């Protein structure tokens, strides 16, 4: 299986990169021209299919779930980011979503394709520490949670960019329709009736960001718990304050603070968006930065 053509796997990744590279300027043009980003969604959808084919081929080529080193996890993260983007755009087909989210999938597949050595891009057998059924459960859930948190944080960054001192209110319904329905007492009859009200672009972005981050936070929680169980089975300890574990906890605390500010303190708009952007930086440190140290139980299979 390891003799399957290496070029086909990398070519699929390169093709996805080209499509996302084409999609990005079109997305920004759609924002400036206020047009619907149908072409961008098509390009991102095809790129996602190419990434799916790449992961399936790599799985067949290596004989294990393709998430065991930095190249494979970056390709998986690019796949998860593009899928998350498509799901968010399905809820609200705005060019702003495409312009905010497309750079993440593009950046992941670009880093995997051009920044990593050929040795890391080649398929290899699993190291003994990763030969566990927990690999798929723990790592894939963590990576999907990163995708949701990254896309949600980029939407929060879009809120900051577009913020004009607008007072936002979190309204929980009809996202994607451009409005929501509110119960209002009519003065004549005294009865309650539902009235449709328009919500602003920033309110829609803020609400979508909140929902996407909430999903990512829940998945991150599951991923950390499953990792602790796996660590206890492999190393006899649920938590060892490994650099990766420590930064994963910091990431969890940042997004817990984000949700706390919204749910308990009633923050919307700019202030929680700033917290989400901090989370964006923390994920980058946790996912890439920690591995540059080359130490800890999670350092294998990332850099030579």
Swiss-Prot record:
The chain crosses the membrane at residues 8-28, 37-57, 63-83, 96-116, 141-161, 212-232, 246-263, 275-295. It is a multi-pass membrane protein. One of its GO terms (molecular function) is heme binding. It is found in: Cellular thylakoid membrane. GO terms for cellular component: plasma membrane-derived thylakoid membrane. The keyword Transmembrane applies. May interact with ccs1. Belongs to the CcmF/CycK/Ccl1/NrfE/CcsA family. This is Cytochrome c biogenesis protein CcsA. The gene is ccsA.
């Amino acid at each position: 299986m390891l003799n399957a053509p290496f070029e086909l796997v990398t070519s699929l990744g390169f093709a996805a990169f080209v499509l996302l590279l084409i999609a990005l300027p079109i997305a920004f043009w759609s924002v400036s021209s206020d047009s619907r980003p149908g072409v961008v969604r098509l390009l991102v959808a095809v790129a996602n299919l190419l990434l799916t084919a790449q992961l399936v081929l790599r799985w067949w080529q290596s004989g294990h779930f393709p998430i065991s080193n930095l190249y494979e996890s970056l390709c998986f993260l690019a796949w998860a980011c593009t899928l998350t983007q498509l799901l968010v755009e399905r809820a609200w087909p705005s060019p702003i979503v495409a312009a905010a989210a497309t750079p993440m999938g593009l950046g992941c597949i670009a880093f995997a394709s051009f920044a990593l050595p050929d040795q890391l891009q080649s398929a290899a057998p699993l190291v003994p520490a990763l030969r566990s059924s927990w690999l798929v459960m723990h790592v894939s859930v963590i990576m999907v949670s990163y995708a949701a948190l990254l896309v949600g944080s980029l939407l929060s960054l879009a809120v900051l960019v577009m913020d004009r001192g607008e007072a936002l209110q979190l309204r929980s319904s009809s996202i994607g329709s451009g409005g929501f329905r509110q119960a209002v007492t009519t003065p004549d009859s005294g009865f309650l009736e539902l009235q449709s009200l328009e919500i602003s672009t920033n309110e829609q972005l803020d609400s979508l960001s909140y929902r996407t981050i909430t999903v990512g936070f829940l998945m991150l929680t599951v991923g950390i718990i499953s990792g602790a169980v796996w660590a206890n089975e492999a190393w006899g300890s649920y938590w060892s304050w490994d650099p990766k574990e420590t930064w994963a906890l910091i990431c969890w605390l940042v997004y817990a603070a984000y949700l706390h500010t919204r749910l308990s303190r009633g923050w919307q708009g700019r202030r929680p968006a700033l917290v989400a952007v901090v989370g964006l930086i923390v994920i980058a440190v946790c996912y890439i930065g920690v591995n540059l140290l080359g130490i800890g139980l999670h350092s294998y299979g990332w850099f030579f």
